Amino acid sequence: MKTKAILLMVFFLGWVTTGWAADHVKGDGKLTSKKISVTDYNEIKVDGVIDFNYEQSDDPSTVEVTVDQNLHPYVNIEVKDRVLTIAFKGAKVDHFTKFIVKTNSKWLAAAKVSGNANFMVNSPLTGDETVIKANANSLVQLKETVTVGKLDLNVSGSANMVVNHLEADKIECDIDGSGSITIKKGNAK
């Protein structure tokens, strides 16, 4: 019994000190942009309050982040197994003015969008197969023509998707929750 009490106390102290260890930062209101080159990717994972702008392009992949000047050191940009993820790391960010990302790659096989993210594809999108999943309260907008063999759209929670123009051999849509998928015009089998 004595050992359990000691272990419980050590666990509790470790848990409390871990909470104190994280830096809490707030944005300073001075928006700045930084642009870097990244290795090529074909999948994107977005989570949180972020305006994410994607373009399909033959140009080398880059990421431009606009956020409060003092928060740039906490922005983590990582490409692992051809998956791009961007998030705050190393601090608990309590408030920021804006968090805007602009990026490009040669093609997009998949995107997973969650939280209150706003994910916009601002160029024509082409490829064999593209899977886009959105959940929570996110918004996905495919603003230009999407020409793919198969487009798989999955919405859960209160997420919404808007496809302005679709040209696909096959489309699959799945909605779970109060979200929506809107296809304004186009053709699919």
Give residue spans per PLM region.
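Intrinsically disordered, low-complexity terminal regions
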Residues: 1-189
